């Protein structure tokens, strides 16, 4: 068995693939052994004596199946989680959505005349300070404090 390492290295460089992907025709080993220049290797590639194996990829089938399950809300339990909760749900975005909802609710209440401008300003500042956890919490507070008036 002749040593074809040099030919394999040249062929890999010409084909722009790794050496493991270069395939020699087993019937033409003597012909390949005689090829010592890059031009000789190019001719053998054109003849089909030397060729590049197709690259193997990783199958995405299982990953697609898992993504489909997660779309339904499955496979999201505590055992599947890595990192802190803020890594899964951005805390800033969480805050933004909550404060926007609370401010929208306050605007609607003010425009409907359910709360005065002064009460609106007081509640707005409280919401900005993180006093309320949610719109429901805000409405509960309003019913308790301002519902009496």
UniProtKB/Swiss-Prot annotation:
Basic and acidic residues composition bias: residue spans:
89-99
Reply yes or no: does the keyword GTP-binding apply: no
Q: Which residues form the signal peptide?
A: none
> What is one process in the GO biological process aspect for this record?
translation
Q: Where is the composition biased (Basic residues)?
A: 59-85
Keyword list, A-Z: Ribonucleoprotein, Ribosomal protein, RNA-binding, rRNA-binding
Q: Its Gene Ontology molecular function terms?
A: large ribosomal subunit rRNA binding; structural constituent of ribosome
Where in this protein does the record put region Disordered? Answer: 46-99
Entry's Gene Ontology cellular component terms: cytosolic large ribosomal subunit
Coiled-coil residue windows:
none
Entry's SMART domains? Ribosomal_L19e
Q: Gene3D superfamilies from the entry? A: 1.10.1200.60, 1.10.1650.10, Single Heli x bin (1.20.5.560)
Family statement drawn from the similarity comment of this UniProt entry: Belongs to the eukaryotic ribosomal protein eL19 family.
What binding partners and quaternary form does the record give?
Part of the 50S ribosomal subunit.
What is its biological role?
Binds to the 23S rRNA.
Q: Mind telling me which PANTHER family this protein's record contains?
A: 60S RIBOSOMAL PROTEIN L19
Which NCBIfam families does the entry mention?
PRK08570.1
* Official protein name in the record: Large ribosomal subunit protein eL19
Per the UniProt record, the source organism is Natronomonas pharaonis (strain ATCC 35678 / DSM 2160 / CIP 103997 / JCM 8858 / NBRC 14720 / NCIMB 2260 / Gabara)
